[in-house]
Structure formats: structure tokens, C-alpha cells
């Protein structure tokens, strides 16, 4: 799975897997001056597996910025960014509009605080950014540069584990 593909410089994404109520980010991507078509080509090349002589992508689902459904002036041919994700054989998971930044931040922080979001040591930038990022200073240049990978983390976390998700009863005891 991957996410956030519509910032141009850099275009950022995270590669992750989920298991139950846990999400693990295994890689981070920042590509300067990239478009969605190039990002998807990069993802397909970097995260493929060959079985019985047939290549498969290990990335099947993408949780992008919701604005990618509109036609893009940066996308070749005026096609939407979602078009290029689907052309790469991936499913797009995005709601009609992006969740509020605070909601994404709360979803990420909630999972981190409960040990349900883990990040590979390989993701040095993301780990550093999460420690340094400050919502109140988000428009300062150093904070803005960090926001791309943070957004790439926030979109899938909020989509899959929103802070307002109803609680699930895992077991009933004593009845």
C-alpha cells in the first residue's frame, strides 16, 4: 500500500502494511519534481515480486490526497492523478475531500501513542519529521518541507483508523 502522491516537489509517499488494527510503515519515498505517472512507475519498479516468471506489484492500494480525482494541469493529457494510479493497477481509496489536518494528526498520534503505528528504522526522514513537526508552525518553510511525508502518513492512517471510528467489541466475558 502507499499514499499521498500529489505534491510535486517533492512528491512523497509511504509504503506500509496493515495487520488487524496495526499499521507498519516500511519505506518512505520523496521524488523531486515528479508527477503521478512517474511516481507510480517508481513504485511498480521498486516494489515488485516475480512469481513463476510473472511480475506482480506488492503495492495494490493507494490512499492519496483527495484532490487527485480532479483533472490535473501537471498530469500529461489533462487526466486525473487517480487515472494514473488505476493505470498502474492499483485501487484508489480516497473520500470526496481530504480530512482536516488536525484529524489526520490526531489519528497518527493516537496510533503512535497506543503502539499501533510502527515505523521502520529505514524511514529516517519520516521519523525525524514526526519528532520535529509542529502544527502551529506549519506554514514556516522548514515545517512545510516536512509536511509531505507527514501527509503521506496521515491519509492512510485516517482513512483506515479515523479517530471517530466506533469502538469494536473484541470479546464478551462473563455472559
Go through the PLM ranges and name each one:
Residues 5-8:
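A short catalytic or substrate-binding loop motif that flags glycine-/basic-rich loops and adjacent residues
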Residues 14, 19-142, 163-164, 169-175:
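Mg2+-dependent endonuclease catalytic cores in nucleic-acid-processing enzymes, primarily RNase H-like
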Residues 142-148:
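Structural motif
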Residues 156-164:
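Short, hydrophobic alpha-helical segments
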Amino acid at each position: 500500500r502507499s499514499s499521498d502522491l500529489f505534491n510535486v516537489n517533492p512528491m512523497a509517499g509511504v509504503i506500509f502494511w496493515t495487520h488487524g488494527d496495526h499499521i507498519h510503515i516500511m519505506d518512505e519515498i520523496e521524488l523531486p519534481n515528479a508527477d503521478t505517472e512517474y511516481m507510480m512507475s517508481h513504485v511498480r519498479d521498486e516494489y515488485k515480486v516475480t512469481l513463476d516468471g510473472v511480475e506482480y506489484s506488492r503495492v495494490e492500494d493507494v490512499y492519496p490526497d483527495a484532490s487527485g480525482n480532479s483533472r490535473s494541469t501537471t498530469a500529461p493529457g489533462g487526466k486525473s492523478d487517480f487515472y494514473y494510479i488505476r493505470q498502474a493497477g492499483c485501487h484508489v481509496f480516497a473520500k470526496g475531500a481530504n480530512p482536516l489536518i488536525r484529524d489526520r494528526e490526531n489519528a497518527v498520534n493516537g496510533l503512535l501513542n497506543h503502539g499501533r503505528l510502527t515505523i521502520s528504522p529505514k524511514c529516517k526522514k519520516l521519523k525525524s519529521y514526526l519528532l520535529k513537526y509542529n502544527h502551529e508552525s506549519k506554514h514556516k518553510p522548514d515545517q512545510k518541507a516536512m509536511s509531505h511525508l507527514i501527509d503521506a502518513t496521515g491519509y492512510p492512517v485516517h482513512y483506515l483508523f479515523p479517530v471517530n471510528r466506533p469502538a469494536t467489541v473484541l470479546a464478551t466475558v462473563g455472559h
